[in-house]
């Protein structure tokens, strides 16, 4: 678990990653969902899908605090941001990622 980098030299990098996360999950992907006919359009769905993918199972078994992006370790947050960018660019299959996420959740 990250300690939120309070007072750390990593704090600016962490803040940048969190801002990227919020932009991609709250704005970029929901806007694209309208034009691409994706199975989800809500920000929390994109957050679930991306975090589940980087953990390889349900993320909520690993992250104690909420909101999750504030408590995910830096490496996984960076991986989730990168995956979100790949989804936005059409380089990762959101349908498949969502299906896997739902399967991990018993859906």
What role is predicted for each listed range?
Residues 1-107:
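Positively charged, phosphate-engaging catalytic surfaces used for nucleic-acid and nucleotide handling
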């Amino acid at each position: 678990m990250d300690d939120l980098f309070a007072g750390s030299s990593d704090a600016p990098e962490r803040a940048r990653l969190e801002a990227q996360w919020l932009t991609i999950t709250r704005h970029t992907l929901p806007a694209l969902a309208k034009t691409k006919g994706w199975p989800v359009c809500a920000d929390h769905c994109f957050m679930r899908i991306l975090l589940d993918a980087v953990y390889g199972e349900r993320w909520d078994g690993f992250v104690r605090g909420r909101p999750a992006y504030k408590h995910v370790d830096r490496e996984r947050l960076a991986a989730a941001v990168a995956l979100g960018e790949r989804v936005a660019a059409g380089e990762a299959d959101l349908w498949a990622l969502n299906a896997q996420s739902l399967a991990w959740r018993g859906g």
